[in-house]
A protein has these predicted regions:
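Conserved CoA-thioester-binding segment of acyl-CoA-metabolizing enzymes
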Residues: 1-71
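Amphipathic alpha-helical segments at domain termini/boundaries
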Residues: 2-34, 175-209, 217-226, 254, ...
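Charged catalytic carboxylate motif
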Residues: 45-49, 94, 101, 200, ...
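Glycine- (often His-adjacent) and acidic-residue-rich active-site loop
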Residues: 47-49, 62, 69-104, 117, ...
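Hydrophobic alpha-helical core bundles mediating ligand binding, dimerization, or RNAP-core interactions
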Residues: 92-99, 205, 223, 235-238, ...
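Crotonase-fold acyl-CoA enzyme core
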Residues: 103-214, 248, 253, 262
Length: 269
């Protein structure tokens, strides 16, 4: 007798190492909060748990937007140094995959950055869709000071954003850049006063909730998938995605709402 294959949805680990998860069903929002004060150092086991958590939140239909933030005045000063030496080769091989979890989410992910945002803290922020930085924020990939290089996708993602010259300046000199500099270079989505950061995050969450979740997922996947594509390939894929969305309920609702001069009621289908 054959059985029908099925997939078990991932679940958030019951005992979290160095972070917590807050879910606000009414606002369709989940917050992943780094919580190992004062510097919110990220351990090796924590990286695995963060990946599983993002996968679980992505599969949770109650959630529309995910926010990655931290407790205290620093987002994260980076990884646990001892963990680098103790980690198995198999664990090290998963570093970039774990930290890329926000990018693989179909839902929009926002990073709220303040204070130190170094090493893996910077790398996981780079994997998010939006980086809102406070004026206190300092970004850095300081691995050269340890005789190493970034190992979780930081230099690769940064080079795509700012080019090889600025990436060498940041990586090879272990240079710190401010939130304002990151905004000017296109690394940060916005740079705001520190006491305005939470308000800006809240406003962005509400803005994103107002769009079709289907259109949001489609746009994110298209942009991620075409990052390394030629212009002609990217245009072709964009056309395919556009054509598919033309048959969606949300597109019809959006057109009707526009013509009727009312707010659309998107349902994600």
């Amino acid at each position: 007798m054959s059985s029908t294959p099925f997939t078990i949805a991932p679940s958030i680990p019951t005992e979290l190492d160095g972070f917590r998860v807050e879910i606000d069903v009414a606002r369709e929002r989940a917050d992943v909060v780094l919580d190992r004060p004062p510097f919110n150092i990220i351990s090796m086991p924590q990286r695995d748990q963060l990946r599983v958590t993002f996968e679980a939140l992505d599969a949770d239909d109650r959630i529309r937007v995910i926010v990655l933030r931290a407790n205290g005045e620093h987002f994260s000063s980076g990884g646990e140094i001892k963990g680098f030496l103790d980690a198995s080769p198999e664990h090290v091989a998963r570093l970039a995959w774990n930290i890329a979890a926000p990018a693989r989410c179909g839902k929009p992910v926002i990073a709220a950055n303040r204070g130190y945002c170094f090493g893996v803290g910077f790398e996981i922020s780079l994997a998010c869709d939006f980086r809102l930085a406070s004026e206190t924020c300092l970004y850095a990939l300081p691995e050269q000071r340890l005789g190493q290089i970034p190992g979780s996708g930081g230099s690769a993602r940064l080079q795509k954003m700012v080019g090889i010259t600025r990436t060498k300046d940041i990586v090879m000199r272990s240079r710190r850049i401010s939130g304002k500099q990151a905004y000017d270079w296109g690394v940060a989505t916005a740079c705001v006063a520190d006491d305005k950061l939470e308000g800006e995050i809240d406003a962005l969450v509400e803005e994103l909730r107002g769009f079709s979740s289907l259109a949001q997922r489609t746009a994110k996947k298209l942009l991620n998938d075409t990052e390394d594509a030629s212009l002609s390939t990217a245009i072709e894929l964009e056309g395919h995605c556009y054509s598919r969305l033309r048959t969606s309920d949300d597109f019809r609702e959006g057109v009707d709402a526009f013509q009727q001069k009312r707010k659309p009621n998107f349902r994600g289908s």
